[in-house]
């Protein structure tokens, strides 16, 4: 009799937990048809299980200035560089650092590329952006620390552990996407690159307004130090970049601080704002949102130019003689070209 009661309670517990899991999964944003940027971080874990394919030469970390401005497909086609972009919307520097830690659980790339715009933020910003980075990470100590470093005053750690606590009110906003992608998702990026082929020229770009203090904050700089130290410890070359986005404005005073830091620590720093002509960037044709980000044309131009820098200034090599990697990229490039054709067709 006692045994039957035990079985009954176990069955009830399993049924309850299963129901809560399904409900939580239903209520969580799917980031497939809308606000697709929220899907980028999680897609990394779906890379090939074959370690020879999974081992990327270059991993980008940072905000939208990496995942919208660089194309790993071009780096592979032109230079045989196997790369991935671990970018997310308004990714803060401490989030980038913990994503670097997370990446090193799976692989040790030769080069880490970090976009420096996020140095402007010294404190947590917005929950919506936090979630687009943090929710996609697999659970680890790095994720826990990233959540703790990122939460605004109104956020609670348990809401990240049990997302149903945060998303219970989405019940009235559910749509067909929530049901269609309940148990599976659809890839929205190409090795972390978010493709946009449409064109909106850069016109009347606002000038930067004077700031009371141009110094990067102590907290932000401490995470840049941690990133530099971790890369050095693991034998990884850290490359700092500033993407050629015209807005948000990049101040000369910020540029001076990054240049000084790179020189002090022996790091390669590339400011693409100063190299748009060399890269062939035309802001009347190569941006889809008036200069904030590159479109497909601009990203491919920038990637060709950066690929040359990577081959000359880092230890990356041409891996197009590796059969398993070539086979994987053949499939990736087919999907890339299909997406490319479809986007151009819709214009």
Task: Briefly describe each language-model feature range.
Residues 8-28:
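Hydrophobic membrane-insertion alpha-helices, especially the h-region
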Residues 52-70, 293-296:
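Catalytic nucleophile-elbow at a beta strand-turn-alpha helix junction centered on a G-D-S/GDSL motif
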Residues 61, 65-147:
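Membrane-embedded segments
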Residues 85-89, 212, 216, 291:
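Acidic/histidine-rich helix-loop elements
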Residues 111-123, 182-279:
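Conserved, well-ordered alpha-helix/loop/beta-strand core segments that scaffold catalytic motifs
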Residues 129-234, 320-347:
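Secreted/periplasmic serine-hydrolase-like ester/acetyl group-modifying domain
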Residues 253-328, 337-347:
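C-terminal regions of proteins
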